Amino acid sequence: MAASAPRFASLAKIIFISSCVTAGCTLLGMVYDSFAIFTHFICYSLAYSAAIAVLTSTTFFARRVWSPPKWRKGAVFVVFAQALVPLSLLIPNGGVELNNPERFSVTWMNLHYETAAVNELVQIVKKRPSDIVVVAEAKIQQLAEAFSDYPFSREVTSASLYVFSKFPLSKVTSVSNDNDRDFLVVEVRVKRRKFTLLAAHVRWPIYSQHAKTLANAAQWATRSENAIVLGDMNSTPWAAPFRRMLRDGDLKHSRQGYGWLNSWHIDSDKHFGLPIDHITYRGKINNTKFELIETEHSDHSAIRGEYVLAGKLTRKPRD
C-alpha cells in the first residue's frame, strides 16, 4: 500500500497539470489567434477541471499527496478562471436610447444542404414569424418555393448565402475574402429607416484566413450607421479574432444576457455542441430578444433575434 502512494501522487500531478495546460490554452485563445481553436472547448475543459477539483477535495486524495490544501486551492482557481468566461454571457448588453424605433426580427440557420432542414425551417418561421430569414448551405432549387411569401430576396450563390425579407432590399454586394467564402451584404429598408445586413459563413479557425475574414466583416460593418452582422462564424464568442471583430466593428453580441446556447452540434443526438452561429449588431439598434431553436435535420440549430431600429429617417417612398 505504501508503494502505491508515490505512483498515485505522480498520476495526480500529471492529471492536474494536464487540466492546467488545457485551461491555459483555452484562456490564451481569448488573446492570441494561434490558440483560438481551444476556446471552442472551454466548457468541456471546465468540466474536466471541475472533476479534478472534486477529486482534490476527497479524503482518498488527501491521504496520498503532499500538502493537499494547496492542490485544492490550485484546482479551484483553475475552475474559477475558466468559469468566468462562459458566465460572462449572462451579462446583458447596454442599450442605446432610441426615438420612435421600428421593429424587425431575424432568423439565421445553416441548412447543411438538407431538404428536410429547409422544410423544418419553414415550419420554424411559421411558428416564430421573422421579417428576415438568412440561410447558408442550401441550393436555390431547395429554396424556390420554401419562402415564396417573402417578396424580396438576394443571394450570393458562390458562398451559398441567401436572404429572404419582407422589407425592401437594395445595394446588394458580394464581398470577396482571400481563400474564404464571400460575404453577402445588402441594405434593408424598414419603413423610413435602414440598416446594412452582412451574412457570412466563415472557415474554421484552423485556417490562417479565419482572422482576416472576421476583420473584413468588422471593416464592412463600420461603413454603415446601423448594421447587423450574422452567420456561421465558426468561432466561439471568446476567441481572439471574434472578440477583435466585435471591438473593431463596434458590434454587440445578441447572445449577451441569454447564456451559452450551443448552435452547432458535435454528435447526432445533439448533447454536445458549440456556440458558433451569431447575430451581432451596431448603431441605433437594440436587441430585445434572442433565442436558439433546436432542429432535427441539420447539424446547426436556428437562431432568432428581435430588434428595434432608429437612426436617420430616409425619404418617404413614392406611391
Model-derived features with residue positions:
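N-terminal, active-site-proximal structural segment of metallo-dependent hydrolase catalytic domains
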Residues: 2-146
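Soluble catalytic domains of enzymes that build or remodel membrane lipids, polysaccharides, and related
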Residues: 106, 112-127, 134-319
